[in-house]
Amino acid sequence: MVFVRSDWSKTWPDPKLATLKEFPGVSLDALKFLHGQRHILFHGHEPLDTDSTPNLEGEAWLMHNGFAQAEGVANLDQAPEAGALVIIGYPKFGGGLGGYARYVAICPPDWPYGTTIGPNDAPLPKSDKLLHYDEASGMRVR
């Protein structure tokens, strides 16, 4: 997985961006190299399209070769250049061509950005009672 950082997301939400015909992109040669020779399955970038060519040749090549991509990615300046594990939470699609997803980078412990969950900072309180599904109420209970 490769994310291309251009800092384009730092200019959001300026309405002038929608009128621009050129923006940072990933060239078709770069896409073919990354997917064909480096064998990545997925890449992401900050602008809302892969490239600013008149026919969006990079985007067309990706879609015709079965590759997925993340568009409109933000905060890449806060992720390390290498060594992060990326978790992608996909939305439930209902017939559309795309949708919003949240990308979370699990970074090395010494990374200066983000949050750290300490041993006493678990998101939920501990309980001696186990959760189980209650048929009558239709939900999990303790």
Where are the regions that the model predicts?
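Active-/binding-site microenvironments in catalytic and ligand-binding cores
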Residues: 1-142
